[in-house]
């Protein structure tokens, strides 16, 4: 081993300065310079090994010197270097290695002929420089550049440009003939790159230590502080230095520069059962999949990397590969702060992809998705080592300059190397046999478009009781942040409610994706089907408007331009073979009716936040008709829709009085007073009536009439056809402005019996906003891909019960074997609890901390249907019809 390589190893792991004879060795056999040890004792009043955190009982002066280090240093000083055959012995290679600053001094033309000097990697690391090129970091111009904006550096082809700093992967700041300015990266070839900055990180959040005695190993810092990264301790913690203090800190609280990312990736402990080959390199240069030539180092830093943190007085020979004089390997300890470790989830893709930023607060955990597209970069020009330099220059044309500096600015909080693709789950429009169905990929196909190492949000669709200590308890509707998907079907993640970290079966949860919708497309949220393609599609709220379509033929509407989306609740995701269809009511109603409709909302039996998305307001909605349907993922293939079959329910009137049942349907196209709610206007006389709706019994299209807005008398005679047609005139939605109706489910036939004084209407249904004291949802979605199903009931009553069939809480899966793929799911029917609502007024505004929470404004009226033990309420906001969680201290009972 020559002198240069040996001296690179003899540096302090803390300050990265060269060790000398005054360095001390600790009882754990780790060696550090005396200055660093004295600084640790002065700041913390105790001495712990920065590598393994072992407490040292003796003082710094009492520690022994490293005998091996002293002998190595003495041997280097006393070893004479033989001059080369051409003379020049007065200049030794040691002088080269001790050169300070960014300038590297050559041994001279005679010394370069020396065998000893010729073996030095620092001198021979690059090909012999062209004559006249300074030994500073420099580049050679490939083309003429005239400059596009003031401050740009103008140069001609062949000019040698001295590099001062790298602004981002597209721009450099350099100097030519004493003139400074900016120039694009793809106009030059880097001959000698800039020295890599030290491994540092920038604090994204404040990290405070409450119990200083218990958390004395932690390194507190404030937002925007710059820390020097020393090493990675475990999966969630790293060790660093701030000023003269050394300690550990959570990885998810900081953003690393390129050098620190490489260091963290090197120190990352191996995870059994996880394919680490899917994680790309930490450097952004490898994303171009070009040559591995050293010139690609120019792309290792983004604009938001900490290039300004480069130490100007740092020697260019300072290697980033830190090595300590350790005889035994350091002991990797777990977090000394279990409370803090439980709150911080691991972001395993820190250097691999764009992780979601996790904002931890006292009220919830918000997951902010990464940017949808990376920064546009210009083409990079790299040359293989076997291609002659002049030949490569002659075969290239001038490239297009990259975007200007201001156009490519990236926020500092954006993770480096953000390459997350924007996944848009387009929905299929329900058409009466007209037009093909747009192709939509399944959840698994969509998941492959995103980086596999990015933490994903999942929702529990079945409860699971842990059997081992490292397993998590799953409660239906609970949100989880998954950051590892093991090969045996188990997931590792953290609960967004309890912040506990553990493993759980993968087929008990479903991914939550956000679909991007437009007003010009049909909005149909994808339901779940099977176990391999489960998922919840959360549709972003937007204004859905457009002209209504006129009916075709027997009152069946044509292909509408807008199909409003339904509310997708995480607590009602159906993964059985018959996936449930979620609908919400459409039509017009008065303000009082809208308020009354909100008073009774289905109370779902879960204790933790669920993913709820507000429905989208519909302009020119139909009087009565299905608002939206859920499609199984596998049924969203690129194939045409089957033609309409007609109403999807057979209505049998039982014990109906001979009094008339007026049904008021406003045909106008005005929006509701409630901005995010659409319901059907229903008025009925109080009388004892019982109507049974039998979904699954198909009826002919001729049974759909085209009358709406008038009152009709239903008489219980033996002519059932006349009765059915009389009701279907009002219930089929066959008006001048309506949505198309879809085919009935294949199986099974489900009955919903409604109490006295109720008139359920097929077609006027809603998943969260029924009109009376009853919320009945029936029907299932077939898995044979024959189209979605619209079926359900809603009625006017104050004292009734709530029953759901084929809903999520009635399906109990079979417990999975230990650490193996879970078995199939067996549905079991069950009944829910009746709905109890209380009116509350908001006294203090509350901003939501997650999508499962409600935004409260002072003076709002909230209908509370559940009060939890932890002080949180679940209710529906009267202002917009949203259902969610909120702290009970922000409202008062009225």
Swiss-Prot record:
The keyword Repeat applies. Residues 306-322, 700-713 have a biased composition (Polar residues). Residues 274-323, 526-556, 682-751 are annotated as: Disordered. Phosphorylated at Ser-305 by AKT1 and AKT2. When phosphorylated, it has reduced ability to bind Rac. Autoubiquitinated. Ubiquitinated by SH3RF2, leading to proteasome-mediated degradation. One of its GO terms (cellular component) is Golgi apparatus. Residues 134-193, 196-259, 453-514, 835-894 form the SH3 domain. It catalyses: S-ubiquitinyl-[E2 ubiquitin-conjugating enzyme]-L-cysteine + [acceptor protein]-L-lysine = [E2 ubiquitin-conjugating enzyme]-L-cysteine + N(6)-ubiquitinyl-[acceptor protein]-L-lysine. Keywords: Cell projection, Cytoplasm, Golgi apparatus, Metal-binding, Phosphoprotein, Repeat, SH3 domain, Transferase, Ubl conjugation, Ubl conjugation pathway, Zinc, Zinc-finger. SMART domains: RING (SM00184), SH3 (SM00326). Residues 281-291 have a biased composition (Low complexity). GO terms for molecular function: MAP-kinase scaffold activity; ubiquitin protein ligase activity; zinc ion binding. It holds the Pfam family SH3_9. Its EC number is 2.3.2.27. Transmembrane segments: none annotated. A zinc finger (RING-type) spans 12-53. Residues 293-363 are annotated as: Interaction with RAC1. It is an enzyme of class 2 (transferase). The modification Phosphoserine is found at residues 305, 540, 743. GO terms for biological process: negative regulation of apoptotic process; negative regulation of extrinsic apoptotic signaling pathway; neuron migration; positive regulation of JNK cascade; positive regulation of proteasomal ubiquitin-dependent protein catabolic process; protein autoubiquitination; protein ubiquitination; regulation of CD4-positive, alpha-beta T cell differentiation. InterPro entries: Endophilin_SH3RF, SH3-like_dom_sf, SH3_domain, SH3RF1/SH3RF3_SH3_4, SH3RF1_SH3_2, Znf_RING, Znf_RING/FYVE/PHD, Znf_RING_CS. The keyword Oxidoreductase does not apply. Pathway: Protein modification; protein ubiquitination. The RING finger domain is required for ubiquitin ligase activity and autoubiquitination. Has E3 ubiquitin-protein ligase activity. In the absence of an external substrate, it can catalyze self-ubiquitination. Stimulates ubiquitination of potassium channel KCNJ1, enhancing it's dynamin-dependent and clathrin-independent endocytosis. Acts as a scaffold protein that coordinates with MAPK8IP1/JIP1 in organizing different components of the JNK pathway, including RAC1 or RAC2, MAP3K11/MLK3 or MAP3K7/TAK1, MAP2K7/MKK7, MAPK8/JNK1 and/or MAPK9/JNK2 into a functional multiprotein complex to ensure the effective activation of the JNK signaling pathway. Interacts with HERP1. Interacts with RAC1; in a GTP-dependent manner. Interacts with MAP3K10/MLK2 and MAP3K11/MLK3. Interacts with MAPK8IP; this interaction leads to the PJAC complex (POSH-JIP or SH3RF1/MAPK8IP apoptotic complex) with a 1:1 ratio. Interacts with SIAH1. Probably part of a signaling complex that may contain SH3RF1, MAPK8IP, DLK1, MAP2K4/MKK4, MAP2K7/MKK7, MAPK8/JNK1, MAPK9/JNK2, AKT1 and AKT2. Found in a complex with RAC2, MAP3K7/TAK1, MAP2K7/MKK7, MAPK8IP1/JIP1, MAPK8/JNK1 and MAPK9/JNK2. Found in a complex with RAC1, MAP3K11/MLK3, MAP2K7/MKK7, MAPK8IP1/JIP1 and MAPK8/JNK1. This is E3 ubiquitin-protein ligase SH3RF1. It comes from Rattus norvegicus. The gene is Sh3rf1.
